[in-house]
Design a protein with these regions (language model features):
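Glycine/threonine-rich flexible loop motifs
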Residues: 58-67
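Short glycine-rich anion-binding loops that position phosphate/pyrophosphate groups of nucleotides
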Residues: 30-31, 55-58, 128, 172
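A cross-family phosphate/adenosyl-ligand binding-site feature
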Residues: 1-41, 45-46
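Glycine-rich phosphate/pyrophosphate-binding loops
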Residues: 77-99
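Short, ordered loop/turn segments at secondary-structure junctions
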Residues: 1, 55, 88-91
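Alpha-helix C-terminal capping segments
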Residues: 38-44, 73-82
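Electrostatically charged, flexible surface regions
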Residues: 98-191
């Protein structure tokens, strides 16, 4: 379980990988370690996409930025690969088969679906035992409760609660024009 690991990487601890089959490995590190080691050491070809997960427990709203699953997708995006984070909305004994089948269908149709480099999709799949016939909804991820409450019908949280598969495009941009203007005078401080 790497909940709350976000974009953490391992320092000062040796990382070990185990090969299960051709191009199938496990690693004792964080989700972001997995992307970096796969990209730099293990993958003999250029990946078309990074898929992080499937993990138990949803990654919704502000929790998404704390997620190791989403963190690994962000790292894939930093390598200029389209990336998908996938979670099943259950902390109990989780059956990943429905989510795996859904992602398999996504991959089968990848040429027909629009997923650009630098794009991240955060996909939350409902517990298939509780919601056996979900719809697919394109949703929004809100980082604060006020925005989520104002836009609840379109939120990832609401649609997952309704038993739907929530697909939220995520864009991370650290630059903010409005805040840039607000602190521009700071450069005039005498040293």
């Amino acid at each position: 379980n790497r909940s709350g690991f976000s974009s953490a990487i391992t320092f000062l601890t040796p990382l070990k990988h185990k090969k299960f089959a051709e191009n199938f490995y496990s690693l004792n590190g964080t989700p972001v370690d997995c992307v970096k080691i796969a990209r730099n050491l293990l993958c003999p070809f250029e990946p078309e996409i990074v898929i992080s997960g499937i993990n138990p427990g949803p990654n919704l709203g502000s929790d998404a930025i704390l997620s190791g699953t989403v963190g690994a997708a962000l790292d894939g995006r930093n390598w200029k690969y389209p990336s998908i984070a996938v979670s099943v909305a259950s902390f109990e004994i989780v059956d990943f088969s429905f989510a795996a089948k859904f992602i398999s269908k996504v991959l089968d149709n990848l040429d027909n679906l629009k997923l650009e480099n630098f794009q991240i999709l955060n996909i939350n799949v409902p517990d298939h035992n509780k919601f056996p016939d979900p719809k697919i909804k394109i949703t929004k991820t809100f980082l604060n409760e006020e925005d989520c409450e104002r836009n609840y019908e379109s939120s990832d949280r609401k649609n997952l609660e309704d038993g739907n598969i929530s697909i939220s495009p995520i864009k991370i941009d650290m630059h903010s024009n409005s805040e840039y203007q607000a602190v521009e005078d700071w450069s005039k401080i005498s040293l």
